[in-house]
Amino acid sequence: MQSTQPIQRCVLGSQQALPELAVSLLDNLGLITMTGNDKKSYLQGQVTCDVVSLETDQVTWGGHCDAKGKLWSVFRLFHYADGYAMLQDKSAIDVELRELKKYAVFAKVEINVSDAILLGVCGVQAEQAIAKLTNNAEAAVVTFAQGTAVKISPQRWLLVVDANQQDEVLAMLATAPLCDHALWDLYDILEVAPRIPAFAQNEHIPQAVNLQAVNGISFKKGCYTGQETVARAKYRGINKRALYRLSGTIAPSAPETTISLERSVGDNWRAAGEALVSYHFDDGRATGLFVLPNDLEPETQFRLAGQSEQLWQREPLPYSLDDE
């Protein structure tokens, strides 16, 4: 259901402060839900995170791999309604749903794509707004009259609401402008939040998108699909890649399509990969998340593919890549 409120395009300058409060329509993300008597044990055997220990007021990162340890998806997992919900990139959901259902015939589970509306409340005033909306911002997962609120990071909350209650919720947040998903994407980029869009499925192991650094891998739980590769990456050091944020210049006339980079190798240049998510500022700059070799020299240079004059550089990570 389309909101009756106008949706603003979120265009910021690279030096501009983020809005103190805004709501993003997250139509580029989706939810897979799982219910049924076997939901906990079934999901526990499929994903990297510890489902069994997840409390009803908690949210955790997780990943779902194929048998070789390559990711079908990364997600934020939380209790929702009578089961679980997995928030992830919408473009990856069709394939992820198929793979997640592969063994469901042997268990008492129902796995579906939710038709709920996803809203992102963000900014330094987000927690105050959520407290007013739900009368409770103490827990990371809060059920309220119109839906469920999930704390994503200190300045971000996800709202999962029924389509017929979307306008009511937005009216309760009327002091915040309604923006497109670009602002939420920018927060993901600044926080270097793992993401797997459709084009990156089956390309990377969990550690290559820093899932271990955001507590999205349990090395103490029982077996799950792809576990051998994930464990080998930790204990034998076979992982050679990591997720980084890069920023640089871009031609003002460049269409906002996927950004691809090249990196310097001696006197030559080599393809460095495609942004998993990117954001274009309004002053000729852009930023995005890229999976790169984790042993690159500090002096490695980057440039836009096909635009050799547009130089990019790595930004500091907001967290350690250690999984301890």
Curated annotation (Swiss-Prot):
Sites where the protein binds folate: 184
A Pfam family annotated for this UniProt entry: YgfZ_barrel
Gene3D superfamilies: 2.40.30.160, 3.30.70.1630, Aminomethyltransferase beta-barrel domains
Source superkingdom: Bacteria
Family named by the database record: Belongs to the tRNA-modifying YgfZ family.
Membrane-crossing residue ranges in chain numbering: none
Task performed by this protein: Folate-binding protein involved in regulating the level of ATP-DnaA and in the modification of some tRNAs. It is probably a key factor in regulatory networks that act via tRNA modification, such as initiation of chromosomal replication.
One cellular component (GO) term of this entry: cytoplasm
Source species of the chain: Vibrio vulnificus (strain CMCP6)
GO-annotated molecular function: folic acid binding
Name this protein carries in UniProt: tRNA-modifying protein YgfZ
Keywords: Cytoplasm, Folate-binding, tRNA processing
PANTHER family xrefs: TRANSFERASE CAF17, MITOCHONDRIAL-RELATED
Compartments reported by the entry: Cytoplasm
Source species taxonomy: Bacteria, Pseudomonadati, Pseudomonadota, Gammaproteobacteria, Vibrionales
